[in-house]
């Protein structure tokens, strides 16, 4: 179903009259306006074979939280699946922090694997939990910026 949904979205974004007859979805001629002025990137999440195949055909992949070795295996598999497909400029590997790599070295390893965007809770690296006051979270973000981000640029 997801593959058909993505195909339908791209058809509708064309701004032209389109119709569709698939295994799961069917519709007669219609158009969706206003059409996007430029392509909308499609990032696909998941780590099952169908999800990785789908991600390989689109603009990027969004991981779950994995160990560093699991992430490396998944990115390797995804890169293999992308071989032979039309290459998209600026393919995105969007990662939730690896649970075993909360350090400058760990974030550096994720960057070296090709991770282009990282999602994390930087204050948690310093022992501040989600229910902590905002000031403590901001302090954790500043520390993360100075100790991790600045050193990885």
Predicted feature residues:
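Active-site-adjacent structural elements that line small-molecule/cofactor binding pockets in enzymes
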Residues: 1-153
